[in-house]
Amino acid sequence: MLELDLQVASETSAPDEARLRLWCEMGLRQRSADSELTIRLVDETEGRELNNTWRHKNYATNVLSFPADVPDDMLDIPLLGDLVICVPVVNREAVEQGKSVDAHWAHMVIHGCLHLLGYDHIDDEEAEEMEALERTLLEELGYPDPYADDESADPPHSDTPSKDHE
């Protein structure tokens, strides 16, 4: 079961909680344990501040993933982590990339959830594994391959803030 804490700190239109939950559940379905995660929807000011604080990059990115860094035996709850999604950035990227807003949101949420599960795209092999899983999950939801238009494209800008990830 997924315990989702949705925090809306953006005035920009975003998908509703039911769709966010569906996409999270799809991204986390390989995890058999219960999961608790927070999604915080932000505008560009907060997105830029968080990206600058945690990644030392002074721009708002689409998704930031913050995995819980607490030993399992220290918690009474199955805390997975937090996703911070910059609503205007995701909406703008969808238009710029010629994708449906819904499909791009699904991709970004699934991408962020996979980061919380430990997937990454630091090297090519990891990126290929993560992208293949994203393609499969999105296809099951009826969305097109997010990488189809440009096979040489970099993965989404979503990152997991950590000193090891730069």
From Swiss-Prot:
It comes from the Bacteria. Keywords: Cytoplasm, Endonuclease, Hydrolase, Metal-binding, Nuclease, Ribosome biogenesis, rRNA processing, Zinc. GO terms for cellular component: cytoplasm. Its EC number is 3.1.-.-. Coiled coil: none annotated. Zn(2+) binds at H111, H115, H121. InterPro entries: MetalPrtase_cat_dom_sf_prd (IPR023091), YbeY (IPR002036), YbeY_CS (IPR020549). Residues 140-166 are annotated as: Disordered. Its cofactor is Zn(2+). Residues 154-166 have a biased composition (Basic and acidic residues). Binds 1 zinc ion. One of its GO terms (molecular function) is zinc ion binding. Pfam families: YbeY (PF02130). PROSITE patterns: UPF0054. The keyword Hydrolase applies. It is found in: Cytoplasm. One of its GO terms (biological process) is rRNA processing. Belongs to the endoribonuclease YbeY family. Single strand-specific metallo-endoribonuclease involved in late-stage 70S ribosome quality control and in maturation of the 3' terminus of the 16S rRNA. This is Endoribonuclease YbeY. The lineage of its organism: Bacteria, Pseudomonadati, Pseudomonadota, Gammaproteobacteria, Pseudomonadales.
